């Protein structure tokens, strides 16, 4: 689909740590509509930084609808949507790919103790991880979060059928893929 006079318009969506923004641009770089919404970052303990995937999904739907509605009022139809999200989030998912718990964000450091133990007791593993990924072993990465989940929330880990990020969750929610 394209918009008026063949002018391509794309909606860019940026899902951040505490809010989401959507903006529609013509190929020429002219902005045609924008919206933003916010959601809370929960820090129930100094080493925890969590969010509810349902709140992020609702906020994302809200801003995309606002921008799409504004474009419709201008007689324009978006050509597509580009999605960018925060990195290193972790959501335990059930068999239907629905969240089983709040999302651990990139800022969640509850797995720091596991990382410390790995660095002390398994330096070769940490070196291999770095050589393969280009990333040092760190509490922000999903691997450390998964290990923490397995060791500290074994009942939740046992019910978890998939592990996803916020981007995975949104793609699944919007496309059922």
Located regions from the model:
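N-terminal glycine/serine-rich phosphate-binding loop of ATP-dependent small-molecule kinases
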Residues: 1-101, 127, 131, 159
